[in-house]
Structure formats: C-alpha cells, structure tokens
Amino acid sequence: MHHRFLLLLRILAWTMAALAGLAAALALFVANYNWNHAKPWLTQRFSEVLQREIRIDGDAQLAWAHGPDTEPTSTRFIPRLRLLARDVTIGNPSWATADQHLARAASVDMTFDLLPLLRQRWNITDLHLVQPVIVLERDAERRKNWRFTDRPEPRWSVDIRRLAFDHADIRYVDRPLDLDLRFDTTPLSGAAGVHIKDDVNDLLVQFGISGKFRDATVDGAGQGGALIGLLNDDGRFPLRAEGKVGKTHVVLSGVLPSPRRLLEFELKLGLSGDSLADLYPATRVPLPATAPFQVSGQLSGARADLTATQWDWHYRKFAGSIGHSDIRGEAQYLQREPRPILRATIQSDKLMPGDLVPSLGQQEKRRGSKPDRTLSSRQFDPEKWDAMDADITVTAQRVEQLPKIALQDLRFVLHLKDRLLTIDPLHFALAEGRVDGRVTMDARQKQMRAQAELEAQALRLRKLFPSLASMQGSFGQLDAHARLAGTGNSIAALLASAEGGVKARVSEGAVSKFILEAAGLNVADAVFAKLYRDRQVHLNCAVADIDVKAGQAHFKQFVVDTDDAVIDVTGHIDLAQEQLDLDIRPQSRELRVFTLRTPLYAKGPFSKPEIAPYKGPLLARAGAAAALALVAPVAAALPLISMGKELPNVCAQH
C-alpha cells in the first residue's frame, strides 16, 4: 500500500514537471518564435472568429503579458497573450460600398485572456490602435458591416475593456437615414481650440465633424467619453457637440447608451437660425419661413425593440423665441404609415404674425417684383405637404401685428393630412369682441384650392381704431361675416380668383362728427371742431354688402347713416389687378355753411391710391362763388351753403 502511494506521488510529480516544462517550453516558444511565419495561421483564426477577412501585411509578434497596476492583484498576474501587428486590415462584406475595408490601422497592440477562448469568449483587456481608419456602414436593407454574423446571437462574443489610440478617422454611413458623417478624433489631452458649451463629465476625446445629413451639410466639433462605451453592451457615452446642420446652428449634450442595446435616449438640444424653413433639408418637415429663431429643449428618441427600424422623437419642454415672439411647448414626430405625423402644442405670451410670416412684400422686392404690387405672388410649396401629416395646437395670450391693435386669447388647431390643411377651430378676441373662423387649403391638385370663413361679433369701433382720438367717443359695435374661396398657389392668385362675399353692420351708437364732416369737406365745421372740440353725432347704422366674383369685389351696398348725413360708397375693387374704383357720395341732412361737400373718388393701385374730390362739382361751386362776389360779398357765400335733404333712414331697411 505504501509502495503504491509513493508510485502515485512520483507519477503526479512527473506529470506536474512535464506540464511545467511544457508551459515553460510554450512560454519560450511564444517569446522566441518568429510569428511572421505563422501570420497565415493567425489571420485564418481571427477571420474565423470575426467571419471577415483579416490581413496582417506588416510584422506580427506574440508575447506573454500581465495586467496593468490598476487591476486587482487577483487578476493582474494571470498570464495573457499580447499580439502586436502592423498594417492590419479588416475586410468589408461584399454588399458594402462606402469603403473596401471596415477598418485598418498602422499597428494593433492587443492583450487578451486565454481561458475565455475555450468558451468562445474573446476578452480583450487592452487594445491600442495607431492611426486607425474605421468605416461603419448600414445599407438600404439595414445590414451593418460591423456585425460579423447574420445569426441573432453570434457564436463568439467580443468584450473590450480598455481602448487607446492616437488619432482616429471614423466615418459613419447610414443609407436609410441618408447620413454620411466623418469624425476626426483625437484624445482630449491633445485638444486645443475647441469651445463647447455646457458641462458633461467624463469627456476623454475630441472630434471634428463633417459630412451631410439628407440635403444638409454638417460641420462642427465635439467632445465625448471613452469610445469603449460605444462598443460594450453596458457602455455609456457622454457627449457634447456644436456645429452647423445646413444653415442651422445646433448644440447637443447628454449621455448615449451603447448602440448595441439602444432602445431609448435623451439629449439636450438647442437650435438657432435665420428661419425655421432652413430645417427642411435635414428634417423633411415643411416648416414656414420665419424670422430668426432660437429654441432649446430635451430631445428623446425611442423604438419598440432592438430590431425596430422606426424611431419616435419627442422634443420636450422646449422654449425660445422667433423674432420678437416667445414660444414654448412640446412636439412629437412619429414614424407611421403612409406618412410620419407631427404633433405639437405651442404656447406664447406674445406672438407677432410678422415673425412667423415675414413681410412677403420685402422679400418680393428683393426678387425684383413690381413695386406697385402689394399682394404676395410668392408661390406656396404644397409639394412639401406630402412629407407628413400634422396636428398642431397653438395658443397665444396676445397677438400683435397692427400698431396699437392686438388680438387676445388666440387659439387654433391646424390639421394636415394627405395635403389637405385645415385650421379649425380658429378663435381670438379683438376690440372687446370675438372672431371665430375656419380655413381650408386643399393641395391635392396642381392648383391649390383655399376657403376661409370668418365671423366677427361685437367689435368695439373705438378699440378697432385706437390711434384716432376722434374715434374714442364712439360706442358703436361691428358685426361681420366673410366667406371667400379661391384657386391658386399664391395669395395674389387666390384673391385674383376669389368667390364669395363680405357683409358687415355697425350697430347704433355715436361716432366722431369731425370724421363725417372731414369726409364731406365741410371746412367751417371741420375747423370749428378742431379749434373748439370734436363733438359726437348719433350713428343710426353702417351697412356693407360686398359681393366677390372672379376676383372682382362689387359694392352692392356700403352706407354710413347718421342723424346729420348719409355717406354712400359705390364701385368695385379689382383684386386681380390690385386696383380701386370707388365713389364716395356724402348727402347732408342739415343746413351747412361754407360747405365744399362734393363726391369723392378713390382710384388707382392698392400701393398708392388717389383719394380726392371730383373737380367738376367743386370747381362749379367755386366759380359761382367768384362770380357772385362781384355782385355782393354776402351773396358769394350762397353756393357754399348746403341746404340739406330729407333722406330716408337707411337702417330701417336693414
């Protein structure tokens, strides 16, 4: 028994010695063998692991290594292999077109554990690259060249603990997104002259960005965390970047999860530029031409699972300004079929329509349009309306456009579906009254069809004309209804083909007598009123009934009826040619001294109309006065006296 035990000990000792000798021999072999002779074997093994062609065109060395001093003692001295290879390339799959290679480097210094290889796990503890060039590509079929197998779960798993490089040229091409970006990346310790706002911790690299996104060029700079955070499943990549996307200035900061497990993320996004319309080349969202804007908020993206290709975007708690208008709210961009959907809720304390639709007249003047045209002939672009559907709710406490006249409590809901745009409902308060309306614009045919309907109730005249001191004594109210429809792809074309009508009525009240007397050129009363006080006269009513056909607005009735006079306006307005042709005929109810009351006319283009009395009646009265002056000075005043008439009360007819 004792003899057998000694024999077993000898066998065990010889076995241990043999293993130790084998290990020593293997260690000596690894350390002293010229591994250049084994490059075909090495590259074949690596190619089998990555399922991609691997080439080593320079020297190759294999040696033993241990972990850095930062590792725990329990793992630091476990033997691991270190591979140093020069001129290394990793090939691309046959379908890739962006570049011949996925990656290439002047040298690769890689240390990895041995035992995990038995479990088909490639644990790379340290990877140092010199001048790496990496081209990542996702094709139209959403295949990724950095994915080394088509199997849902690859046979081999790769884990990289530490990554270092001197300078990396990284290109990312995404065919479905129409994205092609290049990142010129260096360690942050060598960074110089990069100015990025907002603090993000753990920034280790800096990069310059260039390329294109859809139809917009991209140019900027950024800083980020360890690139290893983009490679491992549980990685995180802090990021901040600033630059131009097309004409828009973009500031981005936050933390990205690993792309390998990317289901959702959230970043802080700031945008600024000359016009919201400049976002279209990158976003394909047809926003209007506006005044300069700036906005900042939280951008988040989410998808259903790792295989989903559609992302839903949410821009939360954004706030900023467009021109002199403040804006805040939330927006969602949802990928749906047959078109994406934009949903937004926008609030404003002060909104200026000129900021959202800048002066089209000025834009057209720069384009060389005729100076006597005031209606915009700038073409709408309804083709862009097919890019998405939309549901947008806008509320504003105050809307300022005309001097001293403001709208309050504006609210409208914009719907866009299949190139049919509706604004319904549309509500706002004006001049202590209320305006309700509805607008439809149908771009499903070559020439857009538009229809607008507005109803105004109980608008106070003194609030409608706050700049006229003589109007402040008025307590009349305006009620009106307008309905117009037209066809065309510009404001000018829509009005040139307009059909519909406008009806309005001013209720009984008081208006400034000076306005009426000045309209009739009653010189004596006008001077008296200016010197001694602007008296008020009783307004029976004012009535307007305008019929619009084929762009011609005919005044069926336009009458202002007071206790003192009746003012009748007849004629028409040519909306196609932008021409006025109106007669204004005042008729006195009372005796007037020194009256030059005579019919007026308003003729000419919208941009510079001529408003004056007809010279015939005025000259006849002046000539008669001159002739009578030769007979008697008192008689000379007779032609300037208006005897007045017994006129019917127009309001009784309405």
Predicted regions: what they are:
Residues 371, 531, 620-636:
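Short, cationic low-complexity segments
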Residues 23-139, 290-293, 297, 601:
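Terminal hydrophobic membrane-targeting helix
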Residues 1-51, 56, 634-648, 652-653:
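N-terminal type II signal-anchor transmembrane helix
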Residues 68, 359-383:
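Intrinsically disordered, low-complexity segments enriched in small/polar residues
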Residues 94-98, 112-120, 147-156, 414, ...:
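Short aromatic-glycine motifs in intrinsically disordered, low-complexity regions
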Residues 77-100, 123-143, 162-171, 179-305, ...:
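Small-residue helix/turn framework positions
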Residues 154-156, 379-386:
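Short boundary motifs at domain starts and secondary-structure transition points
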